[in-house]
Design a protein with these regions (language model features):
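Double-stranded RNA-binding/processing signature
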Residues: 1-118
């Protein structure tokens, strides 16, 4: 819950400050590339494959995965909630530098992959 809010704020802040988009509907549409459960799932898989996360962070991600969903793609939802849980945990523990490291990688990943076309 909190991690989702932190991510939403980081994305909106990034888009307002660093994109050339000016219209609100364009900013909202662009934000969907970052805040969708699919982008979270693909990004967390990238982090796991590249050993970007510490062992403790992987454990937090795994414990934070929500197993109940009414959505069709439960794996996507579980990975997304695990990623949001990790961000929320880091926020509550005042690990803001680590949040920014992960978010910088997230921006790079979204901007360099086909997630922008989803």
């Amino acid at each position: 819950y909190l991690g989702d809010s932190v991510l939403e704020l980081l994305v909106r802040d990034y888009l307002v400050k660093e994109s050339e988009l000016k219209k609100v509907n364009e900013l909202c549409q662009e934000a969907t590339h970052f805040v969708s459960s699919l982008s979270h799932e693909k990004f967390i898989l990238h982090l796991l494959e590249t050993d970007f996360l510490t062992e403790e962070e992987v454990g937090i991600f795994k414990r934070g995965r929500n197993t109940k969903t009414s959505k069709r793609d439960t794996k996507e939802h579980r990975y997304s909630t695990g990623f949001e849980c990790l961000i929320g945990h880091l926020y509550l523990n005042e690990c803001k530098d680590r949040i920014y490291e992960i978010f910088d990688e997230f921006k790079r990943y979204v901007n360099e992959t086909n997630l922008r076309q989803i």
